[in-house]
Amino acid sequence: MKRSDIADLILERLQIEKSSLEHCFKTSKDSIGYFFIDDVLPEDIATKIFRAFPDPNSMEIKKSLREHKYITAQMNKYDSILEEVIFAFQDLRIVQLIGNICEINTLYPDNNLYAGGISLMRKEQFLNPHLDNSHDKDRRNWRVLNLLYYISPNWEIEFGGNLEIWPEGIKNKQITIHSKFNRLAVISTNDASWHSVSPITYDASRCCISNYYFSDSPPKKNSIFYVTSFRGRPEQKIRDTILQADNLLRMGVRKVFPKGLIKTNHIYRK
């Protein structure tokens, strides 16, 4: 299936729900703007996408105090439908419509898939509260939106692996967004957009397709560059101290080496 055909279907769903999505984002944007929409694609297509997910052993594993998950952006190694659906979300009609919903004038997709692509998480894997890196890989444009398309059939909220956003900071109560099959969640990314993935408690694969949108303008006034920054969960006092020190160290490195010491592997090398 071609990306243009997939994009047509996504666009139709967004147009149908546009008013409710605008309301959701507008009422939340003063903290962490977000919306989500279900039944993004016909069920048979969404199921086909899930079945195309690769064996996690063929993906890169990220395992540290920050996170534990499988990722890849090298989409030409896998079933073509995965690449097609990722880039369907980069169709300029969809980008423009989501920009209208979120009231962002200039918005660009990222064909490098910097920190995007696909991810897979299994039992006991997690993603701690964090802020996404403020810029694209070349530090030219501002990262402003995170798009997460969940694709695991019959995934119950009790299984964990759900998106959590922390509009009042990580010491206060989070909002949980169920990573429900065939659901798209969109959240704003700025220096207060703390979000996480709850630990998975069920013996199955939670699969996600990720995109980021960028802009010429920062998401907030007086925004500055920052690296991806992790924190501990409220009960993880020691981990939180370690991760805050790690954030400071990596920011210090970027002040000396603006693009970092090591080139990221998490991009699509075509």
Report each predicted region and the residues it spans.
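A structural signal for short, well-ordered beta-strand segments and their strand-loop junctions
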Residues: F36, E60, Y108-N111, G117, ...
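Residue-level detector of short, conserved catalytic/binding motifs and their immediate flanks
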Residues: I32-F35, G116, L145-L147, R183, ...
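Proline-centered turn/helix-capping motifs that create local helix->coil transitions or kinks
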Residues: N57-M59, N105-Y108, S152-I157
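Catalytic core of Fe(II)/2-oxoglutarate
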Residues: H135-R143, P153-K270
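A structural signal for well-ordered alpha-helical scaffolds and beta->alpha junctions
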Residues: P42, A46, L82, D91-V95, ...
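Non-heme Fe(II) oxygenase catalytic core, chiefly the N-lobe of the double-stranded beta-helix
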Residues: R51-P54, I86-R143, Y149, I165-E168
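A eukaryotic "domain-start" boundary segment
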Residues: S4-I10
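Non-heme Fe(II)/2-oxoglutarate
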Residues: R3, I16-I101
